[in-house]
A protein has these predicted regions:
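Conserved acetyl-CoA-binding loop-helix of GNAT-fold acetyltransferases
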Residues: 63-80, 101
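Conserved active-site alpha-helix within GNAT-family acetyltransferase domains
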Residues: 92-109
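Short amphipathic alpha-helix that is part of the acyltransferase structural core
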Residues: 1-24
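Conserved GNAT acetyl-CoA-binding A-motif
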Residues: 80-91
């Protein structure tokens, strides 16, 4: 199993400085505004929102099939922790189809996020 730092480093790759991402995750956990769920080499960073809602961000160093298996376990843990609604954003609607095989159905709709529109997927419990 890889270290948390190695997972973030591999997931962030050349798109940014993995150290900055790691520091942000660590700081938000200490502030009690976020949680991290991990299974295998997949991390789900969860922002705690009002009304038992959460926004999730996924980092993985697993191969595709194993990443989906581990993501499914993380999602089960998030729901078991008492979150009633989970949000996550993607640049296009087809991005949510990868969740269907692991039994995680979502509703999606356009959402204005800052200066650009994205699709927001929502899972209600």
């Amino acid at each position: 199993m890889k270290s948390t730092q190695d997972i973030i480093k591999e997931a962030v790759g050349k798109r940014g400085k993995w150290q900055d991402v790691y520091k942000a995750i660590y700081a938000t956990i200490k502030l009690n505004t976020h949680r991290v769920f991990r299974h295998g080499n997949t991390l789900v960073w969860v922002k705690i929102l009002p009304d038992q809602a959460a926004q999730m961000f996924v980092f993985t160093a697993d191969k595709a099939g194993k990443a989906m298996e581990n993501l499914a376990e993380c999602l089960k843990a998030i729901l078991a922790a008492g979150f009633k609604q989970i949000y996550f954003d993607a640049p296009y609607e087809d991005a949510f189809e990868f969740l269907e095989p692991i039994g995680f159905q979502v509703d999606s709709a356009p959402y204005q996020n800052g200066y650009r529109g994205v699709i927001r997927g929502t899972r209600e419990v």
